């Protein structure tokens, strides 16, 4: 149990610029992880082991990519009780992302808007951080590594970046996620279209099979998709995942829709909206994916989870596992065991 209840620290953090608060929090976790001060935010891990995509997860609740883009805080974040953590998105080369300000709170709706743009230190630094993390994986936690393309890489050459990133992260990942759904990298979502997706996933699957032979183990590969898809688009994506032998899907990323936050301060800021307003759209995509892909295909649900009941709604829609991010910002570490208990059994 955390020694400092999050409701006491949240007003201080929410008094800061959102990105500054984010960096302060990550910096503190990075500094004090694996020390006695980790007890300030640690939570007991709820045991609920489950096998998905051939991996044994300690429980069904994970951290979504984007919170720890550079993999600096894997052990510290793991102390919150997660069964699995996904870090990144990492690109082959470091890049600053979009101009600031680029993160905005909408507290009336427990939501965020961000247009960060895959800001990260690049593959070499990312892998060094991942290799320094020890306690989370030693205690059974699983690690997903999320990959993307550099902003300067033309969309027609996107596969080159993904292949470089896949080869780099493969030896260090329990699973790899291919992020083709961030709205904050120009034209990235075009990779979700029929021919482009088929070509990209075919190239990645060919490389992954070669890497499996090279490293003597098969690392599952997931694809993360957007909530802003109609039924026909989801149907095509599901068929393309199957056709290319992709192991699983993560649904969903942030949304461009603003209906649920219209009229609020910052609602018209460009970027992806996350948090409570995304729950219904994300669950709709999850439910259709489950219908299209069948009962055994691995689905990780993410988007709008701020309570145990929200986590259960993801399971009811068809998700095997559930991730949180924005909910952690609004609810704090206690959200993790709450969701794990709600998903148990």
Curated annotation (Swiss-Prot):
Q: Where does substrate bind?
A: 69, 114-118, 179, 184, 253-254
Q: Listed disulfide bonds for this chain? A: none
Specify where it is mainly localized.
membrane
Check the record and name the InterPro entries matching this protein. Answer: Aldolase_TIM, DHO_dehydrogenase, Dihydroorotate_DH_1_2, Dihydroorotate_DH_2, Dihydroorotate_DH_cat, Dihydroorotate_DH_CS
The Gene Ontology biological process terms listed for this entry are: 'de novo' pyrimidine nucleobase biosynthetic process; 'de novo' UMP biosynthetic process
Q: Which UniProt keywords apply?
A: Cell membrane, Flavoprotein, FMN, Membrane, Oxidoreductase, Pyrimidine biosynthesis
Its membrane topology, per UniProt?
Peripheral membrane protein
* Cofactor entry: FMN
- According to its record, what are the GO cellular component terms? cytoplasm; plasma membrane
Region forming the signal peptide = none
EC identifiers of the protein: 1.3.5.2
- Enzyme class comes to oxidoreductase
Indicate where this protein resides in the cell.
Cell membrane
Q: How is the cofactor bound?
A: Binds 1 FMN per subunit.
Q: Which Gene3D superfamilies match?
A: Aldolase class I (3.20.20.70)
Supply the NCBIfam families for this chain. PRK05286.1-1 (NF003644), PRK05286.1-2 (NF003645), PRK05286.1-4 (NF003646), PRK05286.2-5 (NF003652), pyrD_sub2 (TIGR01036)
What interactions and quaternary structure are annotated?
Monomer.
Name this protein carries in UniProt? Dihydroorotate dehydrogenase (quinone)
